[in-house]
Amino acid sequence: MTETPALEPLAPLELEPLPDEPLESDPRHSPDTDWSPWSAPLALLGGLVLAATAGLVVDLPALAFGVKLTSSHTPAGLVIADTFVQDVAFVVAAYYCARMGHRVVRAWQFGLRPPGVGWRSAAMMIGLLLLGFIMLDAAWSEIVHPSKEKLLETLGTKESTALLIFSAALTCIVAPICEEFLFRGYIFTALRNWHGTLLAAILTGLVFGGVHATSAPAADLLPLALLGFGLCLLYRYTGSLYPGMLAHALNNSIAFASLAGWSWVGAIPLIIGAPASILLLVAACNRAGFFTSPTGLSRSAA
């Protein structure tokens, strides 16, 4: 009788291990992550390099089409386009650094979630931060008498209504969202893994002020650094990036209206409209499931 040969055991399937799912931390404080503190300067440098590179992508075609661009003068429309590209580059750099090492990235890790302390408490903190900053800035101006900022002239707000609208949207909506995403959402969060909240807030504030050296008078950099410090604490103790975006938008709206010479009545639409636009954008993203889906910001890689 012929014996049936024994079947060889099947080799075990070697499945690629799934990336570790980050666990959401206490929502009453800004998220705890495993982002290396040394990746914070990398994110900033990457954002600046990416912004410069992307700026060339915008500027070179403009030159090819006959736009007059010199070292001393850049057309207002091109300044707006370059600044928009810079803001987007900040977001891309922060997200890329968070993804290094094939990490899973979730929206809550960038503070894209409702304030864990509640909106009422968050609103009070926003009010206190802005009141303190306005008083400090007024006192500082009386001491140093800084020169008037020429940002609006650079953006061409007096050249046309369209440039005025685009400038206001860029300054009061786009910039607060993108800058908070990089500086508070990533840099501050990564630096907290080095020596804690206080030093991380100080360093982030200094970097935040320094980045504005090309658009603000030198005398304004210290108040901006202190505002950056305060925004870090606001993020840390509300658990959400949204209050910082709103505070940033309110501050920029007030500054924009002041530089434009508007009355308080004339400034109300911008002061209300900019934060409202951010809230509507957040609501739209949440409704689309971008911030709340199980795969969060990494759904394309899941």
Residue ranges of model-derived segments:
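Functionally important transmembrane alpha-helices
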Residues: 56-60, 202-205, 211, 216-274
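Transmembrane alpha-helical segments in integral membrane proteins
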Residues: 90-102, 174-193
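N-terminal, membrane-interfacial amphipathic/helix-forming hydrophobic leader that caps
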Residues: 1-114, 142, 253-302
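Hydrophobic alpha-helical transmembrane segments
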Residues: 41-45, 80, 119-127, 165, ...
